[in-house]
Amino acid sequence: MAKSSFKLDHTLERRQAEANRIREKYSDRIPVIVEKAERSDIPDIDKKKYLVPADLTVGQFVYVVRKRIKLSPEKAIFIFVKNTLPPTAALMSAIYEENKDEDGFLYMTYSGENTFGLL
């Protein structure tokens, strides 16, 4: 997997400081970075950084991402954490605890494909 552009744009120290500040100020929220997968034909997302409620499910977060990229109903979207599809019913807090980066952020990648094969 290619290195996150967020990681390339910000030093580890800066990312750690920001994640720590966020977690101290909003202990019931999770700092998430969402980026489009390389070579995906799905639209770009308007913002990459999200402060997600800990009790939100992965499925609910997918809905948020879908709305942000204004994805048409016939298109599927897939969210990956470390190149793996997390269970839709899993809580974001559980995914965060298992997969957070050394900088304190949870990195998610999204990709899509046309589920109906329209020509």
Swiss-Prot record:
Keyword NAD applies: no
Transmembrane annotation, as ranges: none
GO BP term, example: cellular response to nitrogen starvation
Gene3D superfamilies assigned: Phosphatidylinositol 3-kinase Catalytic Subunit, Chain A, domain 1
A Pfam family reported for this protein in Swiss-Prot or TrEMBL: ATG8
InterPro entries: Atg8-like (IPR004241), Ubiquitin-like_domsf (IPR029071)
Principal place of residence: membrane
Source species, domain of life: Eukaryota
Residue positions bearing lipid (Phosphatidylethanolamine amidated glycine): G117
Marked site: Cleavage: G117, L118
Propeptide feature ranges: 118-119
PTM comment: The C-terminal 2 residues are removed by ATG4 to expose Gly-117 at the C-terminus. The C-terminal Gly is then amidated with phosphatidylethanolamine by an activating system similar to that for ubiquitin.
Compartment(s) of residence: Cytoplasmic vesicle, Autophagosome membrane; Vacuole membrane; Cytoplasm, Cytoskeleton
Membrane topology, from the record: Lipid-anchor
Molecular function via GO: phosphatidylethanolamine binding
Keywords: Autophagy, Cytoplasm, Cytoplasmic vesicle, Cytoskeleton, Lipoprotein, Membrane, Microtubule, Protein transport, Transport, Ubl conjugation pathway, Vacuole
One of the record's GO cellular component terms: autophagosome membrane
CDD domains tied to this protein: Ubl_ATG8
Description of how the protein assembles with itself and partners: Interacts with ATG4.
Biological role stated in the UniProt entry: Ubiquitin-like modifier involved in autophagosomes formation. May mediate the delivery of the autophagosomes to the vacuole via the microtubule cytoskeleton.
UniProt family annotation: Belongs to the ATG8 family.
Protein name as catalogued: Autophagy-related protein 8B
